[in-house]
A protein has these predicted regions:
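Sec-dependent signal peptide recognition
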Residues: 1-10
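Hydrophobic h-region of N-terminal signal peptides that target proteins for export
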Residues: 10-18
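Short, structurally constrained coil/turn elements
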Residues: 13, 49, 80, 110-112
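Conserved active-site segments centered on acidic
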Residues: 19-90
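Hydrophobic/aromatic beta-strand patches that form the interior of the parallel beta-sheet core
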Residues: 56, 98-101, 115-117
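A short, aliphatic-rich alpha-helical micro-motif
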Residues: 94-95
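Short, polar loop motifs at secondary-structure junctions
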Residues: 101-108
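Phosphate-binding/catalytic loops
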Residues: 108-150
């Protein structure tokens, strides 16, 4: 009976470890536009696919608030989370990240072994919100396809 109990405990521990939510970090200059759009849509689409991932947005030089165009666009899209505040990327953010997506150059001092992708080809979302949002969503869907296979 003792061995069976230990086996059950071991299986529960393995399952809880396997079920831990994995983190994706989206980084843009101000943490107020592209990274917010990306994290918002990543979380929505990952949830729809029942994937155990969560995204956070960060900035290398964060603004004090999410850009008004981003707030407006995400509100119209019904995915805006008013609790999001631009936050500076810290080394500790990258520690347990599964992947880091950069819309800007990686800041000095952030050296990580985490897989990093460069999405800097997407321009400012304030200029043409829908066009930029759609480009971000397309990249997110490709990323989710990749993550789904692992």
């Amino acid at each position: 009976m003792k061995i069976l109990t230990q086996l059950i405990i071991a299986m529960l521990l393995i399952n809880s470890t396997m079920a831990q939510t994995k983190k994706i970090i989206f980084v843009c200059d101000h943490g107020a536009g592209k990274s917010v759009v990306a994290a918002s849509y990543f979380n929505k689409l990952a949830k729809e696919r029942n994937l155990d991932y969560v995204a956070e947005c960060r900035g290398t030089n964060p603004d004090s608030i999410v850009s008004l165009k981003t707030q407006e666009g995400l509100t119209k899209d019904d995915v805006y989370d008013a609790k999001i505040k631009p936050t500076k990327l810290q080394l500790s953010d990258t520690t347990n990240a599964e992947r880091i997506i950069l819309f800007t150059a990686a800041p000095q001092g952030i050296n990580t072994k985490v897989k990093t992708e460069n999405w800097s080809d997407i321009e400012n979302v304030d200029a043409e919100y829908q066009k930029r949002r759609d480009a971000i969503i397309q990249k997110i869907n490709s990323l989710l396809d990749t993550l789904e296979k692992h």
